[in-house]
Structures are given as C-alpha cells and as structure tokens.
C-alpha cells in the first residue's frame, strides 16, 4: 500500500495545484489522522466540543510544517468525501493560527474539479460568512479539552498560502529527503 504522505507528490502543479489527502470529514466530530507507519487512517479522537468540521480537512503530501506535522489543508466541499480521498485542489487562502503557543497555519483550498468554485481564486473571493465559520470552528473545537487554547490570528491571500506550501516542501526535503 502506498504511503500517502511520502509517496504521493505535493501536487500536479504545486504550489498552484496541490493534492489534499482527506482525514476528517465535513459535518463530523471524528478526528482522524493518517498514520504513515500503518499506512492508513486511524481515529485519533472524537472532538470534545459539540462542533463539526466545516469542510473536509487533511494534509498536503510531502510537506512538513513548523508545528512538526504535515501541512494542514481545509478543502471547501459541498459534500463530504471519505478519509484517504485525494483531492486535486487550488490554494486560495492561508488561515494564520496559534495552537497552544505554536504556529499551526491552515491552507484553505477549493477543488479543481468543482464548477461551484471556478471563480474562487483568492481570500477575497471567500465570503465573510465562510471565513467566520472556519475561524469559529478552529477557535472553539478544543474548548472542552483540558489546557488547550487556539486562536486565529489572521488571513493571508493565495500567494501567502503558496509561499507557505513551498516552505513546507522545503522543510519536508530538509527533514526526510
């Protein structure tokens, strides 16, 4: 079985078009994580708070971010996919986030093959409501976990997301290539 983090390239035209490996599903509370040692998707925990993922959430292959994990990506989808699904996606924003004192930014992306998002190219193309719902989730999803604190610090544009992806690719190459 292929290792989706190490064997799959970052994307067909990274950083402009990336692969997003789905771990967590839109509308669910289950926090799945890809375990490269199995390799497969395992249930990490069920969110303690009564909140649900606002969209499909996972990681970018062959990336490693400042928090010591593969780079996180939230792909805006109308309907959930499944854990382990690989989505060809276009980065449109970077949500800058702090998780317990560590930088834990998230790439916000849209599916390349969904016509509903053909006109979404940058952070300004997202509605205020979309950004508010995403931020609300990430600011509250750990509220009922002991001694956990998260904060959304701001929003970067598509270029900031692409620059962060290139940074995560460089870190991956330094650590694992």
From Swiss-Prot:
Name the catalysed reactions: diphosphate + H2O = 2 phosphate + H(+)
Q: Summarize where Mg(2+) 2 binds, as residue positions.
A: 72
Q: Is Transport among this UniProt entry's keywords?
A: no
Quote the Gene3D superfamilies the UniProt record gives.
Inorganic pyrophosphatase (3.90.80.10)
Q: Which residues form a coiled coil?
A: none
Compartment(s): Cytoplasm
Its Enzyme Commission number(s) read 3.6.1.1
Q: Which residues bind Mg(2+) 1?
A: 67, 72, 104
Q: State the UniProt keywords alphabetically.
A: Cytoplasm, Hydrolase, Magnesium, Metal-binding
CC per GO annotation: cytoplasm
Q: How does it assemble?
A: Homohexamer.
Q: Which family does it belong to?
A: Belongs to the PPase family.
What is the protein's name according to its record? Answer: Inorganic pyrophosphatase
Naturally occurring in which organism (per UniProt): Halobacterium salinarum (strain ATCC 700922 / JCM 11081 / NRC-1)
